[in-house]
Amino acid sequence: MSTVVQQVPAELQAALTLINNDPRMRTNNAWALSADKRWSLKFTAELSVPCSSFMPDNSVWHLVLWQEETLIRIEVYPDKSEGISATFQHQNYNFSDASTREWTSGNPCLENTPTVFGRNLWGLEPEALLDRISWRLSRLLLWIDAAAQEKLATTGDAVELPAFPDQSPFTVIGFSEQIDDLPFWASKTGEWGFASSTGLPGAHGTLFLREFLDNKGKLIRTTKWSPFMRKGARTTNAVWSVLPTLPVLAPWQAPRTWQELSHCFAQCGLSLPDLFSDIGRSVRALRKQRAPGLLLLGFPLENKIGDEPARIHWLALRLAGLSNTMTKRPGFRPTERNRRTWDREQPLSQEPIRWVRTQNWAADQLRTRGEAANDIRSKKVLIIGAGSLGSMIAENLMRIGVVSQGILDADLLQTGNLSRHALTMTSVGHNKAAALVEHLNRILPDASARSFSCAFPPESEVAKNSLRQYDVIIDCTGDDGVLKSLAAFDWKSEKIFISLAMTWRAEGLFAFAASETSFPVTDASSRFNASASPEIDMDEARIEGIGCWHPVFPARADDVQLWAAVGTKFICRVVSAPGRIYEYFKQMPDGTVEKEPHEY
């Protein structure tokens, strides 16, 4: 409940004047302050273009401001009685709830796209409060005109799914759909079946889809996930159905009730009541099939408006209303025919849908925040040496999309290693390679790392043949003996060899690369020795622990992280343009890095 306040801040009073001075806006109302400290002002906005069936000439809105930590939020909401009732693109779901607030939930998106990054200087929105209010109101006028003309989303724009009402805040169902998968699912339009899922170990409220079966329970598709994710048990707890298009009500409203979803099915020439009847009959007939709790709706989705569909996308909602073999109703016989009739009732009800959030965990979707070029993402990479530098480079490569990795190391992880290693205390006492691979396979769903818990070269012929399958061989041992072994090993084909080693106190980084059938150890060693790197000073060495004099390499975690970043970029460059390359990187006292290239 809001109350009119006699003493209104000067900036808000100025905003009222600003509205009445605009020929397309007007208000006779006063500012009101709600119990939850939200200022609101009711006003009318007028179109400058012809009206449409969803956008009238005049619509009533509420300008709402409130304090959110150190910022003042400014939003505009439709009035419950005289505002727009439809939901458009670039608008939150527009619903009139039973609260005492006078406005609905459907505030349009008026922000400039760059502001989502939290940097106002990237956008056009000003900083002063009154200027921000004026800017938002002018954006609203542009928005209602575009909505009336159906121009909120135009050809070439990125496709945006509608806002789903009452969607779970963090329960997430992950799936993986690539571009190549679309023809398979397009052939299943109008069909349905069962699906299994597994809980993501250690995560909160997160599932991922494992297998798809037809409606007879026969396996038709398996989703590939990381070895870590495949350890969990599968539960067949979902039903899938493929639609020819996104289920949406004009102009851009996600269905809120089962009846609205039935209407979307009917628009596609399908019947949701028939689907429920068929699902119920199959579940009751399959004695080992537990009652599914989720309904997955798949449909082809394009990346940009006007493009051809690129891949299948899945929506999820809680499945309810199906009868089981024990379902009875007073006055009715508990027959299969009656239960099929009862199953058809839920899709025609006004009961709200409980939408569940879904995400596409396909490789190209996971790394939209940043990934390596395809040149290296397509390569199989072997890292020899899972110490501080090797572990951090392996993690960097995994996160940017180099998912097929082999890690080789014979050593066990010591507690002392943890001060500058990617691993944690839970890995102490384990083989470094095996523990690092376990860590890598937990990073992202498409990870595919394997370990070789041995020294190089391995004695086993099976292991030797496995190593020969890798395209890029990265040495992170800092051991001259390993370089000689790299040269002596019969790789059978041309490889991209890379050797990275930190200098004393991690003041510099040696970086050598070659694309040949064997590692050119003489050239690499001579390059390393010729570089102006700091001399080893045993007086600066640290002891491993009290009671023994076993010197350890002095370097801080931030130094190792720096060289891991530089080394990762070097690896990416070399793979994109193979050849003999040697570079020496030196860290300056202020933390900057200088590169000393060496010509061939």
From Swiss-Prot:
It comes from Enterobacter hormaechei subsp. hoffmannii (strain UCI 50). Pfam families: ThiF (PF00899). Signal peptide: none annotated. The active site is at 109 (for e2-like domain), 548 (for e1-like domain). Disruption phenotype: Essential for CBASS function; when the operon missing this gene is introduced in E.coli it no longer protects against phages T2, T4, T5 or T6. The record marks 420 as: Adenylated. GO terms for biological process: cyclic threonylcarbamoyladenosine biosynthetic process; defense response to virus. In the C-terminal section; belongs to the HesA/MoeB/ThiF family. InterPro entries: ThiF/MoeB/HesA, ThiF_NAD_FAD-bd, Ubiquitin-activating_enz. It comes from the Bacteria. It is an enzyme of class 2 (transferase). Keywords: Antiviral defense, Isopeptide bond, Transferase. This is ATP-dependent ubiquitin transferase-like protein Cap2. Its EC number is 2.3.2.-. Residues 159-373 are annotated as: Linker domain.
